[in-house]
Design a protein with these regions (language model features):
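Conserved beta-loop-beta element that borders a ligand/cofactor-binding pocket
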Residues: 1-21, 79
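Residues that scaffold the ATP/ADP-binding catalytic core of kinase and kinase-like folds
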Residues: 21-22, 135
Length: 165
């Protein structure tokens, strides 16, 4: 609203299922790692038939850095100087694939508790990064396997030493 009323350039960024070191403790990657490490069951909703756009934190940061220095300008087609960009990998990953990749990285099998679909949840979410790629040349660089390996190494170090690096 401010952008339209006062001509203040505004950029909104939508992040898609961010994971990596120092991730939110209430999100699936951190919860799953803790459950796997401690031998607790992971509640797998819709029997694992869900997909998400898991995006490693470095790719999120790269997208942010590319956007920060360039405020949107009004154009003839778009008189309000505002833009919204999705930052993600741009493709859905099956939840079970994510869990298996995490199991491999942690060297331990997960205990899975298959559950029905949660009310209000969606089957698939993923970012359309076409506009971000067009305007800023953004392309995610970190594969799921690479990102999970880095996350798992950091997580294990945190749990065994309490080291906050």
């Amino acid at each position: 609203v401010y952008s339209g009323l006062y001509g203040i350039p505004s950029t909104g960024l939508r992040f898609f299922t961010v994971y990596g070191p120092w991730g939110r403790p209430d999100m699936a990657p951190m919860l799953f790692a803790g459950a796997i490490r401690e031998g607790r069951p992971i509640k797998v909703f819709n029997h694992g038939n869900l997909s998400r756009d898991f995006t490693y934190i470095d790719d999120i940061i790269e997208g942010m850095v590319r956007v920060i220095g360039k405020a949107p300008a009004p154009t003839q087609d778009r008189p309000i100087p505002a833009e919204v960009y999705n930052i993600g990998c741009g493709h859905p990953v099956q939840l079970m694939n994510f869990i298996h990749t995490l199991e491999q990285a942690l060297g331990k099998n997960a205990q899975l508790q298959m559950m029905p679909m949660q009310q209000g949840d969606v089957y698939t979410t993923y970012a359309d990064t076409t506009k971000l790629e067009r305007d800023f040349g953004y392309r995610p660089q970190v594969s799921l396997a690479e990102g999970i390996a880095i996350f798992a190494q950091w997580y294990e170090k945190q749990q065994t030493t309490g080291n906050n690096d």
